């Protein structure tokens, strides 16, 4: 179910599996076991569903049976923007574990349905190539990789695998709640995949190949939490660089926002993200308004940190080293 090259890659890394006890991550758990790939697991309890207690218990049971380390986080209550805040909490939790335990790869169980949902959301917002090409199988971070081994498999493929082998898994009913925007696209993507996955996989391969050209137009020179500093080859690549970076941070750029970026070097996107160009350096960070002491302001000015970026640096005590 996963490629030989992917198996070799996973065997060359110290792996942490993002686990939820749902269909996708349960399938990946047992696929890794069947291929004798070493890994440990991490799970987040958001405390929103009674079933979550059973899922945590099952994760502990699996860790005990198969001699895996398990890391558990209890998320705080999020009063608004649950999906974005939950994602930020989850990936920060994974990152901390990775840094503290010297893991070199984070494994996530995203599959083809997820990838198609992302594409449909992008189309509905007038998105460009970076969003439409979707999730990548391998994303290289500062000191680890994110690897998604199941991107060419459908949800039905994974269900068939689990049911045939009689492996236990849970169904998260919140995935059907339409108050979450992404869930509205799920029935559409599921019905489209009934026509077969080969054509969709081929189209995604082509999109990814074409997007590689644009990825070579910039490089990340500094990264900390939700701050990125990119070095651009040319101003014309700014909209793509912003789009690609914000996609990694969980925000899909709209067509209107892309148009604005063609002509503006300093902007706040969606009232959340500050984007500022200084020479050939592009700064992207969460937009935070705070009172900054005069002496610290001067330090930022001397360090050439753009004004809209300073609030995030100050609130997170980040010293940008370029």
Task: Label each region the model flagged.
Residues 6-13, 139-140, 205-322:
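AMP-forming adenylation/ATP pyrophosphatase catalytic core
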Residues 65-69, 94-98, 130-134, 194-196, ...:
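Glycine-rich loops and low-complexity Gly/Arg-rich segments
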Residues 1-120, 156-157, 164:
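ATP-dependent adenylation/nucleotidyltransferase module used to activate substrates
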Residues 44, 75, 151, 173-175, ...:
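Proline- and acidic/polar-enriched loop/turn elements at helix boundaries
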Residues 80-84, 181-183, 265-266:
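Short, solvent-exposed polar/charged micro-motifs at secondary-structure junctions
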Residues 83, 195-198, 293-298:
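Short, charged, solvent-exposed linker or helix-capping segments at domain edges/interfaces
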Residues 113-250:
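Flexible helical/loop "lid" subdomain adjacent to adenine-nucleotide binding pockets
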């Amino acid at each position: 179910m996963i490629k030989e090259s992917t198996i070799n890659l996973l065997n060359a890394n110290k792996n942490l599996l993002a686990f939820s006890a749902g269909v996708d991550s349960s399938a990946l758990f047992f696929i890794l076991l069947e291929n004798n790939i070493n890994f440990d697991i991490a799970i987040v309890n958001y405390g929103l569903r009674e079933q979550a207690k059973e899922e945590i218990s099952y994760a502990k049971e699996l860790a005990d049976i198969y001699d895996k380390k398990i890391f558990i986080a209890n998320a705080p209550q999020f009063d608004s923007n649950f999906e974005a805040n939950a994602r930020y909490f989850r990936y920060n939790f994974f990152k901390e574990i990775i840094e503290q335990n010297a893991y070199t790869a984070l494994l996530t169980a995203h599959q083809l349905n997820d990838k198609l949902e992302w594409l449909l959301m992008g189309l509905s917002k007038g998105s460009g190539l970076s969003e439409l090409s979707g999730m990548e199988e391998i994303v290289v971070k500062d000191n680890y990789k994110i690897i998604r081994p199941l991107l060419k498999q459908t949800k039905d493929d994974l269900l068939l695998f689990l049911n045939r082998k009689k492996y236990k898994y849970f169904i998260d009913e919140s995935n059907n709640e339409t108050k979450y925007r992404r869930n509205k696209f799920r029935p559409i993507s599921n019905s489209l995949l009934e026509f077969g996955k080969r054509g969709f996989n081929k189209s995604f391969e082509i999109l990814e190949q074409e997007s590689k050209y644009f990825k070579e137009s910039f490089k990340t020179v500094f990264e900390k939490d939700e701050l990125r500093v990119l070095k651009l080859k040319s101003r014309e690549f700014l909209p793509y660089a912003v789009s690609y970076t914000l996609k990694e941070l969980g925000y899909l750029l709209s067509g209107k926002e892309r148009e604005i970026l063609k002509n503006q070097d300093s902007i706040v996107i969606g009232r959340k993200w500050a984007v500022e160009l200084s020479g050939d350096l592009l700064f992207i960070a969460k937009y935070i308004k705070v009172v900054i002491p005069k002496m610290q302001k001067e330090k930022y000015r001397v360090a050439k940190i753009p004004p809209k970026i300073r609030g995030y640096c100050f609130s997170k005590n980040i010293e940008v080293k370029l």
